[in-house]
Amino acid sequence: MSVKTLDDLLAEGVQGRGVLVRSDLNVPLDDDGNITDPGRVIASVPTLQALAEAGAKVIVTAHLGRPKGEPDPKLSLAPVAAALGEKLGRHVQLAGDVVGTDALARAEGLTDGDVLLLENIRFDARETSKDDSERLSLAKALAALVEGPDGSPGVFVSDGFGVVHRKQASVYDVATLLPHYAGTLVAAEVKVLQQLTSSTDRPYAVVLGGSKVSDKLAVIENLATKADSLIIGGGMCFTFLAAQGFSVGSSLLQEEMVDTCRRLLDEYADVIHLPVDIVVADKFAADAEAETVAADRIPDGKMGLDIGPGSVERFTALLSNAKTVFWNGPMGVFEFPAFAAGTKGVAEAIIGATGKGAFSVVGGGDSAAAVRRLGLPEDGFSHISTGGGASLEYLEGKELPGIQVLES
């Protein structure tokens, strides 16, 4: 990645300069508005800390959830501002709007080392607009917040890896208006993904889970030609099992993808590995009674909610000799203790391979959440990404708009 980085910016000097940082602070909240996994907040700290300590006037923009282009109190960044302040060890102001009168007044009142978090950027419909001119108008308003008193432009730091695959105002368009730099997180993430795609030590094992084949089809197609083993679990495995002619009971099934899965199994028979046993239940609930059955013997009326111990053993054998591992997507409903063993077992196998020298990447999203929820050591993996969708699109071979614009 031939872009300027945060280190370059710090070397130039940021004392007294306005710096707009696009962070990824899209954290999960419970019904009471409490953050249940602060991973992304923690990951954003190094860049923000470095800028604040260097005397920049730091303005942070980020989103939370999917508001419909207007303010939604349930998706306010207020709890994030509090958590961010705690992690930074300094007060973080929260603007009452995105680029309105409160944001402007607070931006003008910043002193060196201050941090201001703008309200949820997706409260403004222009952020995600397909209309270039609408996005650009929001980008100009964001750029104006970091303009110097003498009219000199501020700078933009892209540090939200989880959104770099989106062509949005705060990710792409604002970078066309301001001097731009990759933050610590974005630079590290891209370096890891480049290592995965360019200098892969073999055997290379890919572990894919999650619910829908359609969401992972492009990455399956791409990685099946590169990996030595492609392990498939999670809800998506049932469409593959159906493609083998097995009954999957009331398990999650994408019938429209069965023929595609059959073709993939034919083309990559030596690469794709499916579960040999499944943990089933008669309902999707934490208190459901679990039963392990052979993968080709799922009873009618039962749904698969995890891979079984035989599958964990089989996948562990494949992973034990791997030199490179990419994992995206849980093996089962890890949020329910009765259906978490598959995800935990596979994760422990990856940790074991890492301990023997393998390079392992956890591809963000639910996988990263599972690592934390199941109490697994985060340093047991070489890298835990903050961007599931961005990681997958990169590995599909797609251009990421938020990275592409930094290279210009």
Swiss-Prot record:
Its main location: cytoplasm. Substrate binds at residues 24-26, 40, 63-66, 122, 166. GO terms for cellular component: cytosol. Pfam families: PGK. It catalyses: (2R)-3-phosphoglycerate + ATP = (2R)-3-phospho-glyceroyl phosphate + ADP. GO terms for molecular function: ADP binding; ATP binding; phosphoglycerate kinase activity. InterPro entries: Phosphoglycerate_kinase, Phosphoglycerate_kinase_CS, Phosphoglycerate_kinase_N, Phosphoglycerate_kinase_sf. Pathway: Carbohydrate degradation; glycolysis; pyruvate from D-glyceraldehyde 3-phosphate: step 2/5. GO terms for biological process: gluconeogenesis; glycolytic process. ATP binds at residues 216, 304, 335, 364-367. Monomer. Belongs to the phosphoglycerate kinase family. This is Phosphoglycerate kinase.
